[in-house]
């Protein structure tokens, strides 16, 4: 048991060192996936032998570790193949070789240089979707070789050009237009160039408009991101951001009781707000205050002393390794730390975006000390906040 725990600790230390190093070599990305493979194989072995937790790491189910190990092995094979291609000396980041990006449409392709394409429906900028255009694709062809192609956008959708010169669309704007546009009209905006729904011609390469101008009339058709290159056919539709929902109506004013301004001011005059240095010093949940005038105001002022937190956003495995290092080396600089978690879709349990992890502190001074002393990977985003009820 101790030997297994030490082995897992060693793997996770190597992983976190890679995250902090932020190497852009393809060899480092191969090492990253090999370490993930070893980690999942070790956890799978532990689960088979009835071990539920190894050090600070809970052991996942057999199916979970098996699937993660298979994905890691697949990525190792693809990256080893890419190392034998002319593109092995290019800069490659963890994001460029991530499983999520590799599997995003078009699938089984390496992608770089993301850019946002916005689509507005019915001329309403509040009713819009955003799509990702990948500036560079590296795609495996029928001969088992990797070839580079680039992407472009026109009124129909986002495409790349295959080896025969065909436009292969991996985003079709009309699919969502049928759902979100009442009259079927939509406008495509990319790099400050606008394509109107009146455009029906075939895609043609055009030069982007200056960044400070948006043409009132649409160009002949396309706003390309690059010249023609080779690549196989793949046609899929990217995930998208849903249009904004209608605003929530407020209750009628007659249903809300309001005290007269002079009455409220006089009643609140004896309530002392916390000093700036006291904000964030509270470590327990605020109880219910006695009933009476301005009870909610008194609660809010008391809640201003709730304990501070930070929310870290990044890859799930990256956050897990970071949590291990924080607990083993910097435990005196925070109060407690959560497991990694994700937002889920409103209609299913599918994870959305990157992982998150919360760290709670006794006070703002401890949080400031943590942020100044603990090195965090630059690929990890940090958000500050306070929670009522922690």
From Swiss-Prot:
InterPro entries: E2/EBNA1_C_sf, Nucleotide-bd_a/b_plait_sf, Papillomavirus_E2_C, PPV_E2_N, Reg_prot_E2, Regulatory_protein_E2_N, Regulatory_protein_E2_N_1, Regulatory_protein_E2_N_2. There is a cross-link at residue 313 (Glycyl lysine isopeptide (Lys-Gly) (interchain with G-Cter in SUMO)). The keyword Repressor applies. Residues 199-296 are annotated as: Disordered. Pfam families: PPV_E2_C, PPV_E2_N. Gene3D superfamilies: 3.30.70.330, E2 (early) protein, N terminal domain, subdomain 1, Papillomavirus E2 early protein domain. Residues 306-390 are annotated as: DNA-binding domain. Belongs to the papillomaviridae E2 protein family. Binds DNA as homodimer. Interacts with protein E1; this interaction greatly increases E1 DNA-binding activity. Interacts with protein L1; this interaction enhances E2-dependent replication and transcription activation. Interacts with protein L2; this interaction inhibits E2 transcriptional activity but not DNA replication function E2. Interacts with protein E7; this interaction inhibits E7 oncogenic activity. Interacts with host TAF1; this interaction modulates E2-dependent transcriptional regulation. Interacts with host BRD4; this interaction mediates E2 transcriptional activation function. This is Regulatory protein E2. The gene is E2.
């Amino acid at each position: 048991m101790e030997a297994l725990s030490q082995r897992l600790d060693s793997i996770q230390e190597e992983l976190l060192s890679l995250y902090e190093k932020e190497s852009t070599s393809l060899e480092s990305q191969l090492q990253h996936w090999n370490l993930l493979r070893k980690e999942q194989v070790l956890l799978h072995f532990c689960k088979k032998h009835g071990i539920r937790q190894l050090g600070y790491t809970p052991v996942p189910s057999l199916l979970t570790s098996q699937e993660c190990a298979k994905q890691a092995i697949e990525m190792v094979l693809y990256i080893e193949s890419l190392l034998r291609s002319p593109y092995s000396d290019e800069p490659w980041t963890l994001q460029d070789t991530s499983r999520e990006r590799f599997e995003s449409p078009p699938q089984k392709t390496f992608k770089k240089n993301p850019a946002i394409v916005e689509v507005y429906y019915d001329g309403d900028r509040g009713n819009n979707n955003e799509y990702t255009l990948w500036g560079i694709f590296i795609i495996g062809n029928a001969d088992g070789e990797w070839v580079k192609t680039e992407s472009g956008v026109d009124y129909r959708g986002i495409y790349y050009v295959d080896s025969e010169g065909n436009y292969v669309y991996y985003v079709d704007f009309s699919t969502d237009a049928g759902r979100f546009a009442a009259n079927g009209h939509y406008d495509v905006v990319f790099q400050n160039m606008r394509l109107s729904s009146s455009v029906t011609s075939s895609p043609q390469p055009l030069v982007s408009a200056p960044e400070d101008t948006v043409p009132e009339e649409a160009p002949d058709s396309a706003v390309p991101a690059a010249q023609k290159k080779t690549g196989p056919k793949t046609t899929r539709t990217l995930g998208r951001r849903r249009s904004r929902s209608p605003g929530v109506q407020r209750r009628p004013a007659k249903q809300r009781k309001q005290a007269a301004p002079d009455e409220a001011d006089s009643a609140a005059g004896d309530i002392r707000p916390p000093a700036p240095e006291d904000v964030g010093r509270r470590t327990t949940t605020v109880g219910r205050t006695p009933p009476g005038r301005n009870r909610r105001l008194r609660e809010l002022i008391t809640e201003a002393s709730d304990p501070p937190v930070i929310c870290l956003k990044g890859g799930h495995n990256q956050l897990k390794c970071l949590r291990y290092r924080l607990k083993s080396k910097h435990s005196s600089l925070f109060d407690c730390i959560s497991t990694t978690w994700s937002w889920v879709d409103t209609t299913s349990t599918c994870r959305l975006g990157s992982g998150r992890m919360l760290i709670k502190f006794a006070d703002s001074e401890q949080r400031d000390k943590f942020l100044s002393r603990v090195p965090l990977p630059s690929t990890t985003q940090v958000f500050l906040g306070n929670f009522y009820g922690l």
